[in-house]
Amino acid sequence: MPPNPTGPTNSQLRMLARFLRKAARANSASIWRVVAEFVEKPRRQRVIVNVGKLNRVAKEGDVVVVPGKLLAGGQLNKKIIVAAVKISPKAARKVIEAGGEVLTIPELVRKYPRGSGVRIVI
């Protein structure tokens, strides 16, 4: 065993990664396997995305998954559906004020099991 474990030691993140891998196999949707790989990364390599980046890369009505943390930097003026591992309260408020929707990743998988139309933002 390596002296410093790599990947998540947080049991909730490990369960989320396991859930995503099972969903990828069950639905033949490789997008969930890719999201699981990002979730399993060590803490220093995890994804951090600001709301302003979502405003730049997403179109109106897009469904977006952030395999890391969503922070409140920047402005959002598009109605989008966002799911992330963690979302700061201020970022969630900005998404909702723009007319969007905030989901957890398991909720997103249940709503879009095949992953069609879901974009990964890293």
From Swiss-Prot:
Protein's GO biological process: translation
Pfam family of the protein (one): Ribosomal_L18
Any one GO CC term of the record: cytosolic large ribosomal subunit
Family annotation (SUPFAM superfamilies): Ribosomal proteins L15p and L18e (SSF52080)
Alphabetically ordered keywords of this record: Ribonucleoprotein, Ribosomal protein
PANTHER family according to UniProt: 60S RIBOSOMAL PROTEIN L18, LARGE RIBOSOMAL SUBUNIT PROTEIN EL18
Family the UniProt entry places it in: Belongs to the eukaryotic ribosomal protein eL18 family.
Name this polypeptide is given: Large ribosomal subunit protein eL18
Organism: Pyrobaculum aerophilum (strain ATCC 51768 / DSM 7523 / JCM 9630 / CIP 104966 / NBRC 100827 / IM2)
Highest classification ranks of the organism: Archaea, Thermoproteota, Thermoprotei, Thermoproteales, Thermoproteaceae
